[in-house]
Amino acid sequence: WDISETRRLKIREIAVDDVPQLYELYSDASVTRFMEPLFADPEQEILYTKEYIKNVYGFYGYGMWVLESRDSGQIIGRAGLEYKEGFEGLELGFMLGVPYQHKGYAYEACSAILAYGIKELGQRAYCSFVNEDNAASIRLCERLGFAPRDRTKLSGINADGTMVEKEYIQYVYHADDKKP
């Protein structure tokens, strides 16, 4: 199911066949420095992806999607919306493979996703959680019109599979506060 298209990207639901390309993107340690990694065992990731497709997309009607280059058909990253209990609005998350960073793809994708969420889902409030050392994501949030609200701790998973609590800056976006 295609969510949106931009000049350079197709934003669509993930398919099981996309998992090998995700491992290529996540193989660079700089990609997982600020986010949870994929499962170490690709078979586990495939099972997780099947369940995600069935349960998350089917129940919520949104989730994390893949970013596919319209020119090459390659998966260049992921971005999407997720429900985060205890926080206002949907969480906007994003990740790009290293070769695709600093080329405007994240802004292009996230702008389209926000527009989709506002128009198709009727969602007016969004949040994003960014590590204070992730300067590129901070710049992206600010360029998208998000404003820093406060610091918060969230549980996550390290590359070795252990649970960890990390501190993030919570950024917020309210469509009603934006000029048309």
Regions found by a protein language model. Give the residues of each.
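Soluble sensory domains of the PAS superfamily and closely related sensory modules
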Residues: 57-59
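Short beta-turn/strand-loop junction motif enriched in small, turn-promoting residues
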Residues: 53-54, 157
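Short, well-ordered strand-loop elements centered on a beta-strand within folded domains, enriched
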Residues: 54-55, 92
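Conserved GNAT-fold acetyl-CoA-binding loop/helix
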Residues: 30-53, 62-63
